[in-house]
Amino acid sequence: MKDVQNQPDNRNIYLQRVGIRNLQYPVTVMDRNNGYQDTVATINMYVDLPVNFRGTHMSRFVEVLNRYRLGIDPKIIKNMLEELRNNLNASVARVEIEFPYFILKKAPVSSIESFLKYTCRIEGQKTEKLYEFTMSVGVPIMTLCPCSKEISERGAHNQRAMAWIHIKSKKMIWFEELIDAAEQAASSPVFTILKRVDEKFVTEHAYDNPRFVEDVAREIAVRLNRDERISWYRVEVESFESIHDHSAYACVMKDKED
């Protein structure tokens, strides 16, 4: 059959990225407590396209993914990208994988168990000589305003917030380690199920640990600075303010190899 993609192209324009986007696909990811966890990811896969080819072979992206979708980790991603480069005659290959990740948590007093969802993301890019791997996690947390507590006779405004941690590391790091860093930096973690005794504990704990978004970002950064495995990070914290019509935001970035 005629291979239209391999037809020559005379426009002499190099394309930095071609591929597939927003593919919903079952994958298996590493889980610190259970070994592995099955989930459904949203996946983007790209390669570059030389000036002399009209198109890439879209079906090959999913064929390669099928061979590597079980047991996603940094080494698997590296091998997947190298196979993409070879199969598609590309100099650069990139993959972005985002998925819900569930952890079983106990309520702080009643110890009732329920799953809490975190949003995890893995990005990898490979050339002939360079391999870059970034992992990210979005952690739902609670913040209580220190200023509101200071000036109010009764209570203080509090709200849910989201902490995003993005890292590059030299050695294996679990998503759970980043989640712990975010939850420990917050006024309080959040939970899917809370009974009355748990609600009392959470609200009082948050009141005793007031945090601006700036505080949360800095507390997470302190923990990441201590971890010698991490070579680069970006921390973003967004608080969905309960008494304002806007969010509060803080961000800190550091390349520890500079």
UniProtKB/Swiss-Prot annotation:
Entry protein name: GTP cyclohydrolase FolE2
GO MF term list: GTP cyclohydrolase I activity
UniProt-listed InterPro entries: GTP_cyclohydrolase_FolE2 (IPR022838), GTP_cyclohydrolase_FolE2/MptA (IPR003801)
Gene3D superfamilies xref list: Urate Oxidase
Species name: Pseudothermotoga lettingae (strain ATCC BAA-301 / DSM 14385 / NBRC 107922 / TMO) (Thermotoga lettingae)
Gene Ontology BP term (one): tetrahydrofolate biosynthetic process
Catalytic activity field: GTP + H2O = 7,8-dihydroneopterin 3'-triphosphate + formate + H(+)
The protein's annotated pathway: Cofactor biosynthesis; 7,8-dihydroneopterin triphosphate biosynthesis; 7,8-dihydroneopterin triphosphate from GTP: step 1/1
Similarity field: Belongs to the GTP cyclohydrolase IV family.
Enzyme superclass (EC): hydrolase
Xref: Pfam families: GCHY-1
Listed EC numbers: 3.5.4.16
Functional summary from the UniProt entry: Converts GTP to 7,8-dihydroneopterin triphosphate.
Gene transcribed to yield this protein: folE2
